Amino acid sequence: MSENNKNSLESSLRQLKCHFTWNLMEGENSLDDFEDKVFYRTEFQNREFKATMCNLLAYLKHLKGQNEAALECLRKAEELIQQEHADQAEIRSLVTWGNYAWVYYHMGRLSDVQIYVDKVKHVCEKFSSPYRIESPELDCEEGWTRLKCGGNQNERAKVCFEKALEKKPKNPEFTSGLAIASYRLDNWPPSQNAIDPLRQAIRLNPDNQYLKVLLALKLHKMREEGEEEGEGEKLVEEALEKAPGVTDVLRSAAKFYRRKDEPDKAIELLKKALEYIPNNAYLHCQIGCCYRAKVFQVMNLRENGMYGKRKLLELIGHAVAHLKKADEANDNLFRVCSILASLHALADQYEDAEYYFQKEFSKELTPVAKQLLHLRYGNFQLYQMKCEDKAIHHFIEGVKINQKSREKEKMKDKLQKIAKMRLSKNGADSEALHVLAFLQELNEKMQQADEDSERGLESGSLIPSASSWNGE
């Protein structure tokens, strides 16, 4: 192939609508994290969008250098499209063909690249466009793909579904996608914004039990009294009755009962989900956290005597067993090791606690995760190991992290209380005076930053330009 032809082919590739041009890895810390999120979504979306998942897995295989495996995933996607969308097979296959072209390009098989570029061109030319067309089905496919990736892709997924609905406002699939994206983006503060799309999606998809549980979760989070609270419970019960073996329904229903402070019901549902996917790290993690909630329930009851202690240790044992299975299945899971460490500390197993704290410190953590770890380890040093100086050190390290969070405020409060307690015993305590000076300096810096931000907003200097909104 001549250089001109190769350049022309590369130009055509860049115009294709597919995973290789959607920038799906943007903002990801690593390929492992990205893969983990995708597999997390894969295992629970176990009935629908199988072709979408095959395309996404093909992209992941390519990123890992497994191009032959990627091609096998794409072949499977083609088969599924023929089964699921026989009447729209050409339009629905455009993304898959684009992925084929890119994989073959990276394999150096340019003649095969040309075959798939031509297949895309043949379909697009029917709509007076060479290599890409505006199609609600393509927008929908991109939307589901971005939803599977989660995180910072949810906002873009919502835009895709909104765009698709402009052309087909009553389409059940597009409406479901918009509802799920709205649910994910409406975390805090809870508002009516996700309720209406969910209700509309359920009207158009009355057999989609997963949507019903999402609506129940949103209603519960709104904390509305009376009818809507009862409506949420009814929705979950109906979903479980009609879809008793669907893992995404089971898991989301378990979340509903956890939020209602009913850990036993949540554990029952999560264990049922484990029957279908027994080695899933996330399910074991959630079961462990439910047992941890039961630990705190027993501690709050302040049961005395041997029975209370025995019950506490039994619950800690169940929590630890499931959390260890989660850690063994996926040692990158967020917070698992620090939770394990805290549970071992409650059971007076300090060597095990120290081991898991240090394992968590060895990981690459987000700012908030680092703050939480410093808070938990500081508490361990303060209350179990009776080492106030180490506790102070970790609370200070956590507060130094430039991230607003509840954990940061808790550590500031603890430092304040420790310093005041020490000064009440010794007014010249240098460590306590140092802590108070540190907190005073920190508060002054934060106040100055807030004032600078307000001045910037008033002057308009922080308002983004039109080009920034367009991603330029």
From Swiss-Prot:
The C-terminal part folds into a super-helical structure and has an extensively positively-charged nucleotide-binding channel on its inner surface. It comes from Homo sapiens. The keyword Cytoplasm applies. Domain-swapped homodimer. Component of an interferon-dependent multiprotein complex, at least composed of IFIT1, IFIT2 and IFIT3. Interacts with IFIT1 and IFIT3. Interacts with STING1/MITA and disrupts its interaction with MAVS or TBK1. Interacts with EIF3E and EIF3C. Pfam families: TPR_8. Changing K255E: Significantly impairs RNA-binding. Induction: By type I interferons, dsRNAs and viruses. Belongs to the IFIT family. The modification N-acetylserine is found at S2. This is Interferon-induced protein with tetratricopeptide repeats 2. GO terms for cellular component: cytoplasm; cytosol; endoplasmic reticulum. IFN-induced antiviral protein which inhibits expression of viral messenger RNAs lacking 2'-O-methylation of the 5' cap. The ribose 2'-O-methylation would provide a molecular signature to distinguish between self and non-self mRNAs by the host during viral infection. Viruses evolved several ways to evade this restriction system such as encoding their own 2'-O-methylase for their mRNAs or by stealing host cap containing the 2'-O-methylation (cap snatching mechanism). Binds AU-rich viral RNAs, with or without 5' triphosphorylation, RNA-binding is required for antiviral activity. TPR repeats lie at residues 51-89, 90-135, 136-171, 172-208, 247-280, 281-335, 336-366, 367-405, 406-448. GO terms for biological process: antiviral innate immune response; apoptotic mitochondrial changes; defense response to virus; negative regulation of protein binding; positive regulation of apoptotic process; response to virus. InterPro entries: TPR-like_helical_dom_sf, TPR_rpt.
